[in-house]
Amino acid sequence: MATWDDVARIVGGLPLTAEQAPHDWRVGRKLLAWERPLRKSDREALTRAGSEPPSGDIVGVRVSDEGVKFALIADEPGVYFTTPHFDGYPAVLVRLAEIEVRDLEELITEAWLMQAPKQLVQAFLANSG
């Protein structure tokens, strides 16, 4: 399963990325992935919804839209989740200890493809090809 070192390695392999603060990764000024501990209100909302609040490390990752967020949650509810704080926002919360490294890499790369400058994305895709 994935660790913070995996997140740092994956993001660090993408152009124009930086860790702005501990566990806060961006491409330019745009957020890709970040540590997102649960707040008291998050825990209460999850409990009211009948879900056990996770106890391990949580990473928030930008997604293209809420449809993607809800599809990820529906496909793997033991890995992905959300809280009311993120209603209307294209981001998903990930139980870091539960996600496979290859899935994390795909998720973060997709976030980067959405947030990076278009010319940089085109060059990246051309060289990945």
UniProtKB/Swiss-Prot annotation:
Taxonomy, superkingdom: Bacteria
Protein name per the record: Uncharacterized protein Mb2600
Species name: Mycobacterium bovis (strain ATCC BAA-935 / AF2122/97)
